[in-house]
């Protein structure tokens, strides 16, 4: 969870501030802008009772807005026992930079509720979630125009559905009510492709890295993703989708998966679907027959591999284990998985890191698409799909008439099929991740003081935010 007492005494919030300070030093910005960039503009703390098993139980939650230079502000809500204000503020800041990096026009926010969702029944969680939503709505920290939450650790489409329904009941005349949260079930205004978005974005980030030969050569990795050995830490939503798509579509070998009860190793590559089904059925990865079980998952982080994908908690790579990490490339699918001090150690060893502020931005990119869909009140592709199919058919017919040859059915089907919402969302996500990587890469190459992708990403983000601050008179 939050690294308030991280190794070396540097919290997650302090790690983010260190990166901002370093970027601003490189850019030569004034101290006033430095303080504005680091300040969390507002934090709401709420405490409320909910009746659980016949007695009142108190719950405490937070919602932080780091920057409202763009509205609405955006960021997930997590349910976890160790969530605290420090963590929420750090994650809100990260959301500001993340949105700027991938050109999503939102400010940064984050929320958390201190509880273990596994301890409560579905009905109890619904009551807790609806009450938390009411507290946020009452304080104007949840609305389509001001603050738009999304799922995070411990929450998902179900909780977002409860929140949007709570908002709708309070504001039945708000025609845009579905835009008050994203990550909703498709039946309640969600967009197809949101559930896979963060993991899919990790895949697209890695693909773009390997498309640029100079970048992959720097990491000592040749060719494309095919055959690359990948270790994934965390088989939740993000880890599962990243592992599944990389193995199924890019033919990477996911040689190990680390979970809370241990890890499973198979040098020939794990069957990710089978492993995920086993975890769902048994509550962990122990006992899975498709690999060797290792009870100490921390050891598996240090196994030889090409790519390491930490996809769960903050602070899993610290000064204690950074020297033992053997991966050539780390793709930060989680927020803050590498501590500030560990980052410096890894960079000194030449380990390339695709930073969290870019690598896991797929979720907020597709949340942006969902928010647009909610304001437009129409699914993507509805107006144009059949038009493009008809036009494609006319083109095929023209080719056949001119050539006198029959176009094979598989080519016909591929060219004629109109794009549906899934296709358009994936296309938009792919384009966003590609463009952002190229901006980060160009920024790194433009200044010898920028030594790595993380610093390039922060400089890029701060340039965009500072420009916005100046334009609106901050």
Question: Model segments located where?
Answer:
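Adenosine-phosphate binding glycine-rich loop
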Residues: 3-11, 209-210, 324, 328-474
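Short, Gly/Pro- and small/polar-rich lid/capping loops
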Residues: 4-45
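Conserved active-site and cofactor/substrate-binding residues in soluble primary-metabolism enzymes
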Residues: 11, 15-18, 41, 83-86, ...
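Glycine-rich, N-terminal phosphate-binding loop and its surrounding beta-alpha-beta segment
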Residues: 45-53, 58-117
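Glycine/serine-rich phosphate-binding loop and adjoining beta1-alpha1 elements at the start
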Residues: 80, 100-226
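Glycine-rich phosphate/diphosphate-binding loop of Rossmann-like nucleotide-binding domains
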Residues: 189-302
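Rossmann-like adenosine-cofactor binding region
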Residues: 262-353
